[in-house]
C-alpha cells in the first residue's frame, strides 16, 4: 500500500503542518514536500444524486473560509464503496454514503478515524443512534447528517391514533398489509431483535454474534406463520402496496419516507396518518416492534491528497461544514432529509412535520430501531433470512423444523467471509 494511503491526520486545522505517516518505508521528506506543493487546492466532493444545488451555499461558504475550491459531483450513494475502493486515488476527497458501507471501507484501509476535534463535535451534536452509525468498533470514521427509518402509514378513516399503537388492534379493527409471501428481510428481519435476539451481536459488529436459533426465534417464525390465517393481515408484493392502500384493501402498512407522497396521493392528505411502529405480541409476550435504522454520512478519503496534510485537513473541515446544523436545516428544507443533529431535530420546522417527527421517534432510541450492521456478511443475511421468512409464511418449512433452520442460519452467517 502506498504511503499516502496510510496518512493519519493528527489535527484538523487548516494550518496543519505535519502528519503521522504509517508504513512510509523509504519515502523521503523531499518527495513529500514536492507532492504537497504540486497538488492543486481543489477538493472533489461527491454528493447524493439530485443534491448538488442544495449544497451550493454551504460549499460557497467553505470555499470563502478555506481558500479551497470544491468540485461538486453528484454520485449514487449505494455505489460509494464500490467506486472508492476501485481507485481511491482518483475518487472524491469527501463523499456521501449509507452507514452500512462504513465497516468495509474501514477494514480495507480506505478511510481513517476522524480527528479528535470533530469526534468531540459529533458526540456533542448528533443523536446516540446516529453516532453509532458513524462509528466502527467504537471509533468515529464519518460525519452523520441524516437518519432514515420506516414508519407506520395508516388510513385515519379506518383506524384511530390509539388503535395503531397495537398490531393486534390494527388487525382486529381493520387490516395491515405486509410482504411475507416474498419476504423483505429489511422490513421483517428486525422482528427477531424485537424479542431480544441479536444480529451480529449487540453492536452489530460481531460476525459470530447472531443468535436467532432459540425459543424466541422460533416464536417469531410461529408468529409469521400465523399471519397467513390472520383475517386482518393482507399479503402484498412490492408493486401493489400503494394501490391496495388506495383502494381500501389495507388500512395500514409499514414503509419509509420514500412512500409518503404516494401514500398521501392514494388516500388524500386529510386521511393519511403516520405513527411509530406498534407493539406486537410474539410468543405470549408483548414487545415493541423494531425497524432497521439507516444513517446518512459524509466521510473523507485521504488518498487523492497524496500526503498533502493541508488538503486532508481541509477535507475534514468540508465534511464538518456539510453536516453542521445550518447544512442539516437546509437539507431538511430542500430535500426532506431528517436531521441527525439533536438541535435541528428539536426545531419548530422539524417538529411540526408529522413524518419527520415520527422518523425521529423511531430513530432516536434503541427501543424502536436497530442500527443496521456494517459488516460485509449482511449480503448473506439478506438472502438467507428472506428465504427462511418466506418459506415459513408459505408453509414450506414446518413448525418442527423452525429451530434447526434458525440454528443453521446462525452458523451460516458466522461462517461467511
Predicted regions and their residues:
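Alpha-to-beta junction loops
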Residues: 87-97, 174-176, 247-255, 270
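Glycine-centered hinge/linker elements that transmit conformational signals in sensory
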Residues: 206-235
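Short amphipathic alpha-helical coupling segments at ligand-binding clamshell hinges
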Residues: 54-58, 68, 216-223, 306-322, ...
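Hinge/lid segment of periplasmic solute-binding proteins
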Residues: 99-151, 162, 274-275
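Short helix-initiation/N-cap motifs at beta->coil->alpha
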Residues: 74-83, 100, 234-247, 258
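Conserved N-terminal structural module of periplasmic/extracytoplasmic solute-binding proteins
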Residues: 3-13, 17-101, 286, 408-417
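Extracytoplasmic/periplasmic substrate-recognition and gating elements
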Residues: 138, 266-334
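C-terminal capping/gating helix-and-loop segments adjacent to ligand/active sites or protein-protein/ligand interfaces
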Residues: 135, 338, 357-412
Amino acid at each position: 500500500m502506498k504511503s499516502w494511503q496510510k496518512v493519519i491526520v493528527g489535527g484538523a486545522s487548516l494550518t496543519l503542518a505535519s502528519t503521522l505517516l504509517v508504513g512510509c518505508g523509504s519515502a523521503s521528506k523531499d518527495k513529500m514536500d514536492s507532492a504537497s506543493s504540486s497538488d492543486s487546492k481543489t477538493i472533489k466532493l461527491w454528493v447524493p444524486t439530485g443534491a448538488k444545488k442544495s449544497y451550493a451555499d454551504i460549499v460557497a461558504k467553505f470555499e470563502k473560509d478555506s481558500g479551497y475550491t470544491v468540485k461538486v459531483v453528484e454520485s449514487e450513494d449505494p455505489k460509494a464503496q464500490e467506486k472508492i475502493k476501485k481507485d481511491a486515488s482518483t475518487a472524491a476527497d469527501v463523499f456521501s454514503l449509507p452507514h452500512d458501507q462504513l465497516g468495509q471501507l474501514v477494514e480495507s484501509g480506505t478511510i481513517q478515524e476522524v480527528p479528535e476535534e470533530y469526534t468531540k463535535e459529533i458526540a456533542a451534536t448528533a443523536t446516540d443512534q446516529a453516532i453509532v452509525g458513524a462509528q466502527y468498533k467504537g471509533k468515529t470514521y464519518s460525519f452523520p447528517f441524516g437518519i432514515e427509518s420506516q414508519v407506520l402509514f395508516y388510513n385515519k378513516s379506518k383506524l384511530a391514533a390509539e388503535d395503531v399503537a397495537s398490531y393486534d388492534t390494527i388487525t382486529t379493527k381493520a387490516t395491515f398489509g405486509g410482504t411475507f409471501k416474498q419476504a423483505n428481510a429489511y422490513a421483517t428481519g428486525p422482528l427477531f431483535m424485537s424479542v431480544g435476539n441479536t444480529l451480529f451481536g449487540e453492536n452489530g459488529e460481531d460476525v459470530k454474534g447472531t443468535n436467532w436459533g432459540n425459543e424466541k426465534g422460533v416464536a417469531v417464525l410461529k408468529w409469521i406463520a400465523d399471519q397467513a390465517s390472520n383475517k386482518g393481515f393482507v399479503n402484498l408484493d412490492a408493486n401493489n402496496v400503494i394501490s391496495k392502500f388506495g383502494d381500501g384493501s389495507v388500512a395500514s402498512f409499514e414503509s419509509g419516507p420514500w412512500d409518503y407522497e404516494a401514500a398521501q396521493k392514494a388516500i388524500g392528505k386529510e386521511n393519511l396518518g403516520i405513527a411509530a411502529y406498534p407493539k406486537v405480541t410474539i410468543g405470549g409476550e408483548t414487545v415493541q416492534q423494531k425497524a432497521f435504522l439507516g444513517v446518512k454520512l459524509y466521510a473523507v478519503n485521504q488518498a487523492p491528497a497524496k500526503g498533502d496534510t493541508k488538503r486532508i485537513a481541509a477535507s475534514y473541515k468540508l465534511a464538518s461544514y456539510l453536516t453542521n446544523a445550518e447544512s442539516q436545516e437546509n437539507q431538511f428544507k430542500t430535500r426532506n432529509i431528517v436531521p441527525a443533529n439533536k438541535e435541528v431535530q428539536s426545531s419548530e420546522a422539524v417538529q411540526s412535520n408529522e413524518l419527520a417527527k415520527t422518523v425521529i421517534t423511531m430513530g432516536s432510541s434503541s427501543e424502536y430501531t436497530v442500527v443496521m450492521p456494517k459488516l460485509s456478511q449482511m449480503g448473506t443475511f439478506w438472502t438467507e433470512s428472506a428465504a427462511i421468512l418466506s418459506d415459513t409464511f408459505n408453509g414450506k418449512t414446518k413448525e418442527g423444523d423452525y429451530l434447526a433452520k434458525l440454528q443453521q442460519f446462525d452458523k451460516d452467517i458466522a461462517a461467511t467471509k
